[in-house]
Protein backbone atom coordinates (compact mmCIF):
# COMPACT_ATOMS: atom_id res chain seq x y z
CA UNK A 1 0.00 0.00 0.00
CA UNK A 2 1.32 3.44 -0.95
CA UNK A 3 1.31 5.61 2.20
CA UNK A 4 1.75 8.79 0.12
CA UNK A 5 -1.56 8.29 -1.71
CA UNK A 6 -3.75 10.14 0.86
CA UNK A 7 -1.33 13.10 0.92
CA UNK A 8 -1.08 13.15 -2.85
CA UNK A 9 -4.88 12.98 -3.06
CA UNK A 10 -5.23 15.87 -0.61
CA UNK A 11 -2.80 17.98 -2.64
CA UNK A 12 -4.69 17.15 -5.82
CA UNK A 13 -7.99 18.14 -4.23
CA UNK A 14 -6.45 21.37 -2.96
CA UNK A 15 -5.15 22.23 -6.43
CA UNK A 16 -8.52 21.40 -7.91
CA UNK A 17 -10.21 23.65 -5.35
CA UNK A 18 -7.87 26.53 -6.15
CA UNK A 19 -8.55 26.11 -9.87
CA UNK A 20 -12.29 26.12 -9.21
CA UNK A 21 -12.01 29.33 -7.17
CA UNK A 22 -9.91 31.01 -9.85
CA UNK A 23 -12.36 29.94 -12.54
CA UNK A 24 -15.27 31.24 -10.45
CA UNK A 25 -13.51 34.60 -9.97
CA UNK A 26 -13.02 34.93 -13.72
CA UNK A 27 -16.66 33.96 -14.31
CA UNK A 28 -17.87 36.55 -11.80
CA UNK A 29 -15.74 39.29 -13.40
CA UNK A 30 -16.99 38.42 -16.89
CA UNK A 31 -20.59 38.26 -15.67
CA UNK A 32 -20.31 41.65 -13.99
CA UNK A 33 -18.86 43.22 -17.13
CA UNK A 34 -21.51 41.61 -19.32
CA UNK A 35 -24.38 42.56 -17.02
CA UNK A 36 -23.20 46.17 -16.73
CA UNK A 37 -22.59 46.45 -20.47
CA UNK A 38 -26.05 45.11 -21.25
CA UNK A 39 -28.06 46.72 -18.48
CA UNK A 40 -26.71 50.30 -18.55
CA UNK A 41 -26.53 52.46 -21.64
CA UNK A 42 -23.90 55.20 -21.89
CA UNK A 43 -24.01 57.97 -24.47
CA UNK A 44 -22.42 61.38 -25.03
CA UNK A 45 -24.61 64.07 -26.58
CA UNK A 46 -23.25 67.41 -27.83
CA UNK A 47 -25.44 70.47 -27.31
CA UNK A 48 -24.68 74.07 -28.34
CA UNK A 49 -26.05 77.02 -26.39
CA UNK A 50 -27.11 79.81 -28.79
CA UNK A 51 -27.40 82.28 -25.91
CA UNK A 52 -23.69 81.90 -25.08
CA UNK A 53 -21.98 82.17 -28.46
CA UNK A 54 -23.02 78.63 -29.37
CA UNK A 55 -20.99 77.23 -26.47
CA UNK A 56 -20.49 73.47 -26.56
CA UNK A 57 -22.00 71.60 -23.62
CA UNK A 58 -21.27 67.90 -23.99
CA UNK A 59 -23.44 65.67 -21.80
CA UNK A 60 -22.60 62.11 -20.81
CA UNK A 61 -25.68 60.09 -19.85
CA UNK A 62 -26.05 56.73 -18.12
CA UNK A 63 -29.39 54.97 -17.85
CA UNK A 64 -30.70 51.48 -17.22
CA UNK A 65 -32.04 50.03 -20.45
CA UNK A 66 -35.13 48.49 -18.90
CA UNK A 67 -36.05 51.73 -17.10
CA UNK A 68 -35.41 53.71 -20.27
CA UNK A 69 -37.78 51.44 -22.22
CA UNK A 70 -40.45 51.90 -19.55
CA UNK A 71 -39.97 55.68 -19.70
CA UNK A 72 -40.12 55.67 -23.51
CA UNK A 73 -43.42 53.81 -23.27
CA UNK A 74 -44.75 56.46 -20.88
CA UNK A 75 -45.03 54.02 -17.98
CA UNK A 76 -42.67 55.82 -15.59
CA UNK A 77 -40.78 59.07 -15.11
CA UNK A 78 -37.07 58.67 -14.48
CA UNK A 79 -35.55 60.47 -11.50
CA UNK A 80 -32.62 62.64 -12.60
CA UNK A 81 -29.15 63.01 -11.10
CA UNK A 82 -26.78 65.70 -12.38
CA UNK A 83 -23.10 64.80 -11.88
CA UNK A 84 -20.60 67.66 -11.88
CA UNK A 85 -16.88 67.06 -12.42
CA UNK A 86 -13.91 68.71 -10.74
CA UNK A 87 -11.76 71.45 -12.25
CA UNK A 88 -9.75 70.28 -15.31
CA UNK A 89 -11.34 66.81 -15.00
CA UNK A 90 -13.54 65.36 -17.74
CA UNK A 91 -17.23 64.66 -17.22
CA UNK A 92 -16.55 61.05 -18.23
CA UNK A 93 -14.25 60.41 -15.24
CA UNK A 94 -16.99 59.60 -12.72
CA UNK A 95 -18.54 56.49 -14.23
CA UNK A 96 -18.34 54.69 -10.87
CA UNK A 97 -20.85 57.26 -9.56
CA UNK A 98 -23.10 57.39 -12.62
CA UNK A 99 -23.33 53.59 -12.54
CA UNK A 100 -24.68 53.64 -8.97
CA UNK A 101 -27.39 56.10 -9.98
CA UNK A 102 -28.21 54.20 -13.16
CA UNK A 103 -28.56 50.91 -11.22
CA UNK A 104 -30.98 52.70 -8.92
CA UNK A 105 -33.14 53.69 -11.90
CA UNK A 106 -31.92 57.26 -12.36
CA UNK A 107 -31.12 59.09 -15.56
CA UNK A 108 -27.56 60.23 -14.76
CA UNK A 109 -26.60 63.41 -16.63
CA UNK A 110 -22.98 64.64 -16.58
CA UNK A 111 -22.32 67.97 -18.35
CA UNK A 112 -18.82 69.08 -19.34
CA UNK A 113 -18.33 72.44 -17.63
CA UNK A 114 -14.96 73.73 -18.80
CA UNK A 115 -13.47 73.84 -22.28
CA UNK A 116 -9.85 74.12 -23.46
CA UNK A 117 -10.64 77.64 -24.71
CA UNK A 118 -11.82 78.86 -21.29
CA UNK A 119 -9.47 81.17 -19.37
CA UNK A 120 -7.60 79.49 -16.51
CA UNK A 121 -9.09 79.61 -13.03
CA UNK A 122 -7.16 81.99 -10.78
CA UNK A 123 -7.28 82.11 -6.98
CA UNK A 124 -8.22 85.57 -5.70
CA UNK A 125 -8.13 85.84 -1.93
CA UNK A 126 -10.84 88.12 -0.56
CA UNK A 127 -13.29 87.53 -3.40
CA UNK A 128 -16.34 85.23 -3.09
CA UNK A 129 -15.24 81.60 -3.12
CA UNK A 130 -11.64 82.83 -3.65
CA UNK A 131 -12.42 83.97 -7.18
CA UNK A 132 -14.27 80.85 -8.32
CA UNK A 133 -17.68 82.52 -8.65
CA UNK A 134 -17.52 83.07 -12.47
CA UNK A 135 -16.69 79.38 -13.04
CA UNK A 136 -19.39 78.30 -10.59
CA UNK A 137 -22.01 80.47 -12.28
CA UNK A 138 -20.92 79.12 -15.67
CA UNK A 139 -21.48 75.62 -14.31
CA UNK A 140 -24.98 76.55 -13.14
CA UNK A 141 -25.76 77.91 -16.61
CA UNK A 142 -24.45 74.67 -18.15
CA UNK A 143 -26.71 72.62 -15.88
CA UNK A 144 -29.83 74.60 -16.72
CA UNK A 145 -29.06 74.42 -20.43
CA UNK A 146 -28.32 70.68 -20.27
CA UNK A 147 -31.58 70.00 -18.40
CA UNK A 148 -33.51 72.09 -20.94
CA UNK A 149 -32.03 70.12 -23.84
CA UNK A 150 -32.41 66.74 -22.14
CA UNK A 151 -36.15 67.35 -21.83
CA UNK A 152 -36.28 67.09 -25.63
CA UNK A 153 -34.20 63.90 -25.64
CA UNK A 154 -36.00 62.15 -22.78
CA UNK A 155 -39.24 63.94 -21.87
CA UNK A 156 -40.33 61.21 -19.45
CA UNK A 157 -37.97 62.18 -16.66
CA UNK A 158 -38.44 64.34 -13.57
CA UNK A 159 -36.40 67.48 -14.24
CA UNK A 160 -38.36 69.60 -11.77
CA UNK A 161 -36.46 68.26 -8.75
CA UNK A 162 -33.06 66.71 -9.39
CA UNK A 163 -30.34 65.15 -7.29
CA UNK A 164 -27.24 67.33 -7.57
CA UNK A 165 -23.86 65.57 -7.30
CA UNK A 166 -20.32 66.87 -7.61
CA UNK A 167 -16.66 66.36 -6.77
CA UNK A 168 -14.41 69.24 -5.71
CA UNK A 169 -15.30 72.22 -7.93
CA UNK A 170 -18.29 70.20 -9.13
CA UNK A 171 -19.39 69.89 -5.51
CA UNK A 172 -19.19 73.66 -5.14
CA UNK A 173 -21.28 74.06 -8.30
CA UNK A 174 -23.80 71.60 -6.85
CA UNK A 175 -24.05 73.41 -3.52
CA UNK A 176 -24.27 76.83 -5.16
CA UNK A 177 -27.01 75.59 -7.51
CA UNK A 178 -28.91 74.26 -4.50
CA UNK A 179 -28.51 77.61 -2.73
CA UNK A 180 -29.78 79.60 -5.70
CA UNK A 181 -32.50 77.18 -6.83
CA UNK A 182 -33.61 75.17 -3.76
CA UNK A 183 -37.02 74.39 -5.27
CA UNK A 184 -35.28 72.48 -8.08
CA UNK A 185 -33.38 70.18 -5.70
CA UNK A 186 -34.31 66.76 -4.36
CA UNK A 187 -31.03 66.07 -2.54
CA UNK A 188 -27.32 66.89 -2.77
CA UNK A 189 -24.23 64.68 -2.76
CA UNK A 190 -20.77 66.24 -2.67
CA UNK A 191 -17.30 64.76 -2.68
CA UNK A 192 -14.85 67.10 -0.97
CA UNK A 193 -16.21 70.47 -2.07
CA UNK A 194 -14.02 73.18 -0.59
CA UNK A 195 -15.47 76.64 -1.26
CA UNK A 196 -19.27 76.89 -1.10
CA UNK A 197 -20.76 76.38 2.40
CA UNK A 198 -23.29 73.63 3.04
CA UNK A 199 -26.93 74.64 3.28
CA UNK A 200 -28.23 74.13 6.80
CA UNK A 201 -31.91 75.03 6.41
CA UNK A 202 -32.88 71.35 6.20
CA UNK A 203 -34.88 71.68 2.96
CA UNK A 204 -33.26 68.54 1.54
CA UNK A 205 -30.86 65.83 2.61
CA UNK A 206 -27.14 66.26 2.01
CA UNK A 207 -24.46 63.57 1.87
CA UNK A 208 -20.83 64.64 1.75
CA UNK A 209 -17.65 62.59 1.55
CA UNK A 210 -14.59 64.32 3.00
CA UNK A 211 -10.98 63.48 2.20
CA UNK A 212 -8.02 63.25 4.53
CA UNK A 213 -5.76 65.38 2.38
CA UNK A 214 -3.41 68.05 3.71
CA UNK A 215 -3.30 69.78 0.30
CA UNK A 216 -7.07 70.17 -0.02
CA UNK A 217 -8.71 71.74 3.02
CA UNK A 218 -12.21 73.28 3.00
CA UNK A 219 -12.44 77.00 3.60
CA UNK A 220 -13.63 78.04 7.08
CA UNK A 221 -17.39 77.69 7.45
CA UNK A 222 -17.88 75.32 4.52
CA UNK A 223 -18.55 72.14 6.54
CA UNK A 224 -20.98 72.59 9.47
CA UNK A 225 -20.25 71.18 12.91
CA UNK A 226 -21.79 67.91 14.10
CA UNK A 227 -24.73 69.57 15.85
CA UNK A 228 -25.68 71.60 12.78
CA UNK A 229 -25.39 68.51 10.59
CA UNK A 230 -27.72 66.53 12.83
CA UNK A 231 -30.31 69.29 12.91
CA UNK A 232 -30.19 69.89 9.14
CA UNK A 233 -30.18 66.26 7.98
CA UNK A 234 -26.60 66.38 6.71
CA UNK A 235 -24.50 63.21 6.66
CA UNK A 236 -20.74 63.76 6.61
CA UNK A 237 -18.56 60.74 5.87
CA UNK A 238 -14.93 61.28 6.88
CA UNK A 239 -12.77 59.02 4.74
CA UNK A 240 -9.10 58.19 4.83
CA UNK A 241 -8.68 58.91 1.12
CA UNK A 242 -7.01 61.69 -0.82
CA UNK A 243 -8.97 64.41 -2.61
CA UNK A 244 -8.24 63.09 -6.08
CA UNK A 245 -9.03 59.48 -5.16
CA UNK A 246 -12.71 60.32 -5.54
CA UNK A 247 -12.95 59.69 -9.28
CA UNK A 248 -12.45 56.85 -11.73
CA UNK A 249 -8.66 57.03 -11.49
CA UNK A 250 -8.78 56.54 -7.72
CA UNK A 251 -8.04 53.24 -5.96
CA UNK A 252 -10.72 50.56 -5.97
CA UNK A 253 -10.98 50.73 -2.17
CA UNK A 254 -12.01 54.39 -2.35
CA UNK A 255 -14.53 53.88 -5.13
CA UNK A 256 -16.15 50.79 -3.62
CA UNK A 257 -16.51 52.51 -0.22
CA UNK A 258 -18.10 55.58 -1.78
CA UNK A 259 -20.37 53.42 -3.95
CA UNK A 260 -21.55 51.49 -0.91
CA UNK A 261 -22.36 54.54 1.19
CA UNK A 262 -23.98 56.33 -1.75
CA UNK A 263 -26.18 53.34 -2.53
CA UNK A 264 -27.29 53.14 1.11
CA UNK A 265 -28.07 56.87 1.11
CA UNK A 266 -30.16 56.54 -2.06
CA UNK A 267 -31.95 53.48 -0.72
CA UNK A 268 -32.97 55.35 2.42
CA UNK A 269 -33.82 58.68 0.80
CA UNK A 270 -35.72 57.45 -2.26
CA UNK A 271 -39.31 56.85 -1.28
CA UNK A 272 -40.15 54.69 -4.29
CA UNK A 273 -39.49 51.00 -3.73
CA UNK A 274 -39.49 50.46 -7.48
CA UNK A 275 -35.95 51.68 -7.89
CA UNK A 276 -34.19 48.36 -7.36
CA UNK A 277 -31.20 46.88 -9.20
CA UNK A 278 -32.23 45.33 -12.50
CA UNK A 279 -32.73 41.52 -12.55
CA UNK A 280 -30.26 39.69 -14.77
CA UNK A 281 -29.28 36.11 -15.44
CA UNK A 282 -26.17 36.46 -13.27
CA UNK A 283 -26.03 35.41 -9.59
CA UNK A 284 -27.83 37.67 -7.10
CA UNK A 285 -24.54 38.54 -5.45
CA UNK A 286 -23.54 40.40 -8.60
CA UNK A 287 -26.54 42.73 -8.63
CA UNK A 288 -27.34 43.09 -4.95
CA UNK A 289 -27.01 46.50 -3.35
CA UNK A 290 -23.72 47.04 -1.51
CA UNK A 291 -23.87 46.84 2.25
CA UNK A 292 -23.78 49.86 4.54
CA UNK A 293 -20.64 51.68 5.62
CA UNK A 294 -20.46 53.17 9.14
CA UNK A 295 -20.89 56.94 9.34
CA UNK A 296 -18.06 59.23 10.37
CA UNK A 297 -15.53 56.41 10.37
CA UNK A 298 -12.46 56.39 8.09
CA UNK A 299 -13.24 54.06 5.21
CA UNK A 300 -9.62 53.27 4.42
CA UNK A 301 -6.15 54.65 4.90
CA UNK A 302 -2.87 55.11 3.12
CA UNK A 303 -4.21 54.99 -0.44
CA UNK A 304 -1.89 55.75 -3.34
CA UNK A 305 -2.46 59.44 -4.11
CA UNK A 306 -3.29 60.62 -7.62
CA UNK A 307 -1.76 63.62 -9.26
CA UNK A 308 -3.17 66.78 -7.68
CA UNK A 309 -5.82 68.72 -9.55
CA UNK A 310 -6.14 72.44 -8.74
CA UNK A 311 -9.45 73.56 -7.29
Question: Model-predicted segments: where are they?
Answer:
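An N-terminal hydrophobic leader/cap segment in hydrolases
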Residues: 17-18, 24-70, 276
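Serine-hydrolase catalytic machinery in alpha/beta-hydrolase-like enzymes
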Residues: 48-157
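Primarily recognizes the serine-hydrolase "nucleophile elbow" in alpha/beta-hydrolase
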Residues: 148-202
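Short beta-strand/loop motif that positions the catalytic acidic residue
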Residues: 207-210
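Conserved alpha/beta-hydrolase "acid-adjacent" motif
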Residues: 215-221
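Catalytic histidine neighborhood in serine/cysteine hydrolases
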Residues: 228-245
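Catalytic active-site module of serine/aspartate enzymes centered on a nucleophile-bearing elbow/loop
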Residues: 250-286
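Long, low-complexity, intrinsically disordered segments
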Residues: 286-311
Amino acid sequence: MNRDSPKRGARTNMKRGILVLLSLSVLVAVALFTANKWAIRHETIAFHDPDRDNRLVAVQIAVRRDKEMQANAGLIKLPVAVLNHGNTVKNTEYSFLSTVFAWRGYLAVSPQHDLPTDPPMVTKVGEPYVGRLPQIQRGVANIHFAIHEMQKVQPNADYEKVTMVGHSMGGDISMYFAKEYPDEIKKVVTLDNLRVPFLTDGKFKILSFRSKDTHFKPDPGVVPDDEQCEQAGITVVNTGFQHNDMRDTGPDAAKSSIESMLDKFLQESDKSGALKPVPTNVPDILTASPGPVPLSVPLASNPTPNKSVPN
